[in-house]
Design a protein with these regions (language model features):
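N-terminal cationic and glycine-rich segments that engage phosphates or anionic surfaces
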Residues: 1-125, 129-139, 202, 248
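Positively charged, low-complexity, intrinsically disordered RNA-binding extensions
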Residues: 139-250
Length: 250
Protein backbone atom coordinates (compact mmCIF):
# COMPACT_ATOMS: atom_id res chain seq x y z
CA UNK A 1 0.00 0.00 0.00
CA UNK A 2 1.38 3.41 -0.96
CA UNK A 3 1.92 6.31 1.41
CA UNK A 4 -1.21 7.92 -0.03
CA UNK A 5 -3.38 4.87 0.70
CA UNK A 6 -1.95 4.47 4.19
CA UNK A 7 -2.73 8.10 4.99
CA UNK A 8 -6.26 7.65 3.57
CA UNK A 9 -6.73 4.63 5.83
CA UNK A 10 -5.64 6.58 8.92
CA UNK A 11 -7.89 9.51 8.00
CA UNK A 12 -10.89 7.23 7.42
CA UNK A 13 -10.56 5.67 10.88
CA UNK A 14 -10.61 9.10 12.53
CA UNK A 15 -13.52 10.63 10.59
CA UNK A 16 -16.49 8.98 12.26
CA UNK A 17 -17.59 11.59 14.81
CA UNK A 18 -20.52 13.92 14.12
CA UNK A 19 -18.26 16.97 14.46
CA UNK A 20 -15.84 15.65 11.86
CA UNK A 21 -18.73 14.62 9.60
CA UNK A 22 -20.16 18.16 9.70
CA UNK A 23 -16.75 19.61 8.80
CA UNK A 24 -16.38 17.07 5.99
CA UNK A 25 -19.77 18.05 4.56
CA UNK A 26 -18.73 21.70 4.54
CA UNK A 27 -15.53 20.87 2.65
CA UNK A 28 -17.34 18.64 0.18
CA UNK A 29 -19.95 21.34 -0.47
CA UNK A 30 -17.18 23.76 -1.43
CA UNK A 31 -15.60 21.13 -3.67
CA UNK A 32 -18.95 20.52 -5.39
CA UNK A 33 -19.47 24.26 -5.89
CA UNK A 34 -16.03 24.64 -7.47
CA UNK A 35 -16.56 21.64 -9.75
CA UNK A 36 -19.95 22.94 -10.90
CA UNK A 37 -18.54 26.42 -11.45
CA UNK A 38 -15.70 25.16 -13.62
CA UNK A 39 -17.46 22.40 -15.57
CA UNK A 40 -21.22 22.90 -15.34
CA UNK A 41 -23.92 21.50 -13.11
CA UNK A 42 -24.59 18.17 -14.85
CA UNK A 43 -22.63 15.34 -13.17
CA UNK A 44 -23.08 13.15 -16.26
CA UNK A 45 -21.17 15.68 -18.37
CA UNK A 46 -18.74 16.85 -15.67
CA UNK A 47 -16.48 14.05 -14.35
CA UNK A 48 -15.05 16.22 -11.59
CA UNK A 49 -18.54 17.09 -10.35
CA UNK A 50 -19.58 13.44 -10.57
CA UNK A 51 -16.64 12.48 -8.36
CA UNK A 52 -17.47 15.26 -5.89
CA UNK A 53 -21.12 14.18 -5.71
CA UNK A 54 -20.13 10.53 -5.26
CA UNK A 55 -17.86 11.49 -2.37
CA UNK A 56 -20.63 13.57 -0.81
CA UNK A 57 -23.11 10.70 -1.06
CA UNK A 58 -20.56 8.31 0.43
CA UNK A 59 -20.32 10.73 3.37
CA UNK A 60 -24.13 10.66 3.71
CA UNK A 61 -24.53 14.32 2.77
CA UNK A 62 -28.25 15.16 2.29
CA UNK A 63 -29.36 15.47 -1.34
CA UNK A 64 -30.74 18.98 -0.82
CA UNK A 65 -27.33 20.12 0.45
CA UNK A 66 -25.66 18.62 -2.62
CA UNK A 67 -28.16 20.32 -4.94
CA UNK A 68 -27.68 23.67 -3.22
CA UNK A 69 -23.89 23.41 -3.58
CA UNK A 70 -24.28 22.67 -7.30
CA UNK A 71 -26.59 25.64 -7.77
CA UNK A 72 -24.09 27.91 -6.02
CA UNK A 73 -21.51 26.81 -8.55
CA UNK A 74 -23.74 27.39 -11.56
CA UNK A 75 -24.90 30.76 -10.21
CA UNK A 76 -28.52 29.71 -9.71
CA UNK A 77 -28.15 30.40 -5.98
CA UNK A 78 -26.09 33.22 -4.50
CA UNK A 79 -23.02 32.09 -2.59
CA UNK A 80 -19.45 32.84 -1.61
CA UNK A 81 -16.72 33.31 -4.19
CA UNK A 82 -14.17 30.51 -3.77
CA UNK A 83 -10.74 29.87 -5.25
CA UNK A 84 -8.50 26.81 -5.15
CA UNK A 85 -5.04 27.16 -3.62
CA UNK A 86 -2.27 24.56 -3.54
CA UNK A 87 0.10 24.77 -0.57
CA UNK A 88 3.50 23.05 -0.76
CA UNK A 89 5.97 22.44 2.00
CA UNK A 90 8.23 20.14 3.96
CA UNK A 91 7.47 18.21 7.11
CA UNK A 92 9.66 16.56 9.76
CA UNK A 93 12.32 14.32 8.26
CA UNK A 94 12.32 16.39 5.08
CA UNK A 95 9.22 14.74 3.62
CA UNK A 96 7.23 16.62 0.98
CA UNK A 97 3.65 17.61 1.78
CA UNK A 98 0.96 19.16 -0.40
CA UNK A 99 -2.35 20.57 0.85
CA UNK A 100 -5.15 21.51 -1.52
CA UNK A 101 -7.54 24.15 -0.21
CA UNK A 102 -10.73 25.90 -1.29
CA UNK A 103 -11.03 29.33 0.30
CA UNK A 104 -13.06 32.51 0.08
CA UNK A 105 -10.18 34.48 1.61
CA UNK A 106 -6.63 33.55 0.61
CA UNK A 107 -5.22 36.34 2.83
CA UNK A 108 -6.69 34.54 5.85
CA UNK A 109 -5.98 30.96 4.82
CA UNK A 110 -2.32 31.28 3.76
CA UNK A 111 -0.90 32.51 7.09
CA UNK A 112 -3.01 29.94 8.94
CA UNK A 113 -1.57 27.11 6.83
CA UNK A 114 1.93 28.51 7.38
CA UNK A 115 1.37 28.34 11.15
CA UNK A 116 0.16 24.74 10.94
CA UNK A 117 3.37 23.74 9.17
CA UNK A 118 5.60 25.60 11.63
CA UNK A 119 3.86 24.33 14.78
CA UNK A 120 4.38 20.76 13.62
CA UNK A 121 8.07 21.08 12.78
CA UNK A 122 7.67 21.75 9.08
CA UNK A 123 7.82 24.77 6.84
CA UNK A 124 5.63 26.12 4.06
CA UNK A 125 7.53 26.33 0.78
CA UNK A 126 7.26 28.40 -2.37
CA UNK A 127 5.14 27.48 -5.36
CA UNK A 128 6.59 24.48 -7.25
CA UNK A 129 8.94 23.64 -4.36
CA UNK A 130 7.58 20.08 -4.05
CA UNK A 131 4.81 19.81 -6.68
CA UNK A 132 7.31 18.34 -9.15
CA UNK A 133 7.51 15.25 -6.92
CA UNK A 134 3.81 14.46 -7.44
CA UNK A 135 1.46 13.49 -10.26
CA UNK A 136 -2.32 13.73 -10.36
CA UNK A 137 -3.73 10.19 -10.41
CA UNK A 138 -6.93 8.30 -9.84
CA UNK A 139 -6.54 5.96 -6.86
CA UNK A 140 -8.95 3.18 -5.89
CA UNK A 141 -8.60 0.87 -2.89
CA UNK A 142 -10.16 -2.61 -3.09
CA UNK A 143 -10.33 -4.96 -0.11
CA UNK A 144 -8.21 -8.04 -0.82
CA UNK A 145 -10.82 -10.20 0.93
CA UNK A 146 -13.62 -9.04 -1.37
CA UNK A 147 -12.29 -9.84 -4.83
CA UNK A 148 -10.50 -12.46 -6.90
CA UNK A 149 -7.11 -11.07 -7.92
CA UNK A 150 -7.28 -12.33 -11.52
CA UNK A 151 -10.75 -10.84 -11.99
CA UNK A 152 -9.63 -7.49 -10.57
CA UNK A 153 -6.52 -7.41 -12.75
CA UNK A 154 -8.46 -8.22 -15.91
CA UNK A 155 -11.19 -5.62 -15.40
CA UNK A 156 -8.82 -2.93 -14.16
CA UNK A 157 -6.30 -3.26 -16.98
CA UNK A 158 -9.06 -3.38 -19.61
CA UNK A 159 -10.47 -0.10 -18.30
CA UNK A 160 -7.49 2.20 -18.06
CA UNK A 161 -5.59 1.07 -14.95
CA UNK A 162 -1.89 1.87 -15.08
CA UNK A 163 -0.99 -0.30 -12.11
CA UNK A 164 -2.59 -2.76 -9.69
CA UNK A 165 -0.58 -3.48 -6.56
CA UNK A 166 -1.37 -5.98 -3.83
CA UNK A 167 -0.91 -5.10 -0.17
CA UNK A 168 -2.59 -6.25 3.02
CA UNK A 169 -5.45 -5.49 3.42
CA UNK A 170 -6.14 -3.70 0.12
CA UNK A 171 -5.35 -3.73 -3.55
CA UNK A 172 -4.45 -0.31 -4.89
CA UNK A 173 -5.47 0.53 -8.45
CA UNK A 174 -3.85 3.56 -10.11
CA UNK A 175 -5.05 5.28 -13.29
CA UNK A 176 -4.86 8.57 -15.17
CA UNK A 177 -7.40 11.16 -13.96
CA UNK A 178 -9.34 11.02 -17.23
CA UNK A 179 -9.80 7.23 -16.84
CA UNK A 180 -11.00 7.34 -13.23
CA UNK A 181 -14.76 7.52 -13.91
CA UNK A 182 -14.64 4.72 -16.52
CA UNK A 183 -12.53 2.47 -14.30
CA UNK A 184 -14.68 3.06 -11.23
CA UNK A 185 -17.87 2.36 -13.21
CA UNK A 186 -16.40 -0.88 -14.61
CA UNK A 187 -15.45 -2.12 -11.15
CA UNK A 188 -18.89 -1.26 -9.80
CA UNK A 189 -20.58 -3.00 -12.75
CA UNK A 190 -18.56 -6.12 -11.92
CA UNK A 191 -19.79 -5.83 -8.30
CA UNK A 192 -16.27 -5.31 -6.99
CA UNK A 193 -16.64 -3.30 -3.75
CA UNK A 194 -14.53 -0.15 -3.68
CA UNK A 195 -13.17 0.82 -0.26
CA UNK A 196 -12.26 4.33 -1.38
CA UNK A 197 -11.63 6.23 -4.59
CA UNK A 198 -10.32 9.67 -5.41
CA UNK A 199 -8.40 11.76 -7.91
CA UNK A 200 -5.49 13.16 -5.95
CA UNK A 201 -1.78 13.97 -5.89
CA UNK A 202 0.41 10.86 -5.69
CA UNK A 203 4.16 10.97 -5.05
CA UNK A 204 6.44 9.62 -7.78
CA UNK A 205 8.79 8.20 -5.15
CA UNK A 206 8.45 7.73 -1.40
CA UNK A 207 10.78 8.35 1.52
CA UNK A 208 10.81 6.57 4.89
CA UNK A 209 11.91 8.72 7.86
CA UNK A 210 12.48 7.21 11.29
CA UNK A 211 9.43 6.34 13.38
CA UNK A 212 9.46 9.49 15.51
CA UNK A 213 9.68 11.76 12.46
CA UNK A 214 6.89 9.77 10.79
CA UNK A 215 4.66 10.24 13.84
CA UNK A 216 5.28 13.99 13.58
CA UNK A 217 4.46 13.92 9.86
CA UNK A 218 1.14 12.23 10.60
CA UNK A 219 0.33 14.84 13.26
CA UNK A 220 1.13 17.60 10.74
CA UNK A 221 -1.08 16.01 8.10
CA UNK A 222 -3.90 15.59 10.60
CA UNK A 223 -3.58 19.25 11.60
CA UNK A 224 -3.72 20.32 7.94
CA UNK A 225 -6.69 18.05 7.30
CA UNK A 226 -8.49 19.59 10.29
CA UNK A 227 -8.25 23.07 8.76
CA UNK A 228 -11.64 24.19 7.50
CA UNK A 229 -10.35 25.18 4.05
CA UNK A 230 -8.17 22.13 3.30
CA UNK A 231 -9.82 19.55 1.04
CA UNK A 232 -6.97 17.04 0.64
CA UNK A 233 -3.44 16.36 1.88
CA UNK A 234 -0.73 14.32 0.14
CA UNK A 235 2.78 13.27 1.10
CA UNK A 236 5.72 11.24 -0.17
CA UNK A 237 6.19 9.76 3.31
CA UNK A 238 5.89 5.97 3.44
CA UNK A 239 4.37 4.95 6.77
CA UNK A 240 5.99 1.74 8.12
CA UNK A 241 3.67 -1.23 8.67
CA UNK A 242 4.54 -1.38 12.37
CA UNK A 243 3.35 2.21 12.81
CA UNK A 244 0.20 1.48 10.77
CA UNK A 245 -0.55 -1.41 13.13
CA UNK A 246 0.04 0.85 16.14
CA UNK A 247 -2.28 3.55 14.77
CA UNK A 248 -4.91 0.94 13.93
CA UNK A 249 -4.77 -0.45 17.45
CA UNK A 250 -3.59 -3.86 16.26
Amino acid sequence: MSGHSKWSSIKHKKAATDKKRSKLWSKLARYITMAARDGGGDPAANPRLRLAVDKAKAANMPNNTIEKAIKKGTGDVEGESYEEVLYEGYGPGGVAIMAQAVTDNRARTSPEIKKVFERSGGNLGAQHSVAWMFNTKGVLAISADAVDEDKLMEIALENGAEDVSAADPDYEVICAPEDFARLKAALEAAEIPIQSGDVTMVASNSVTPDLEATRKVIRLMEALDEHDDVTSVSTNCDIPDELMAELSGN
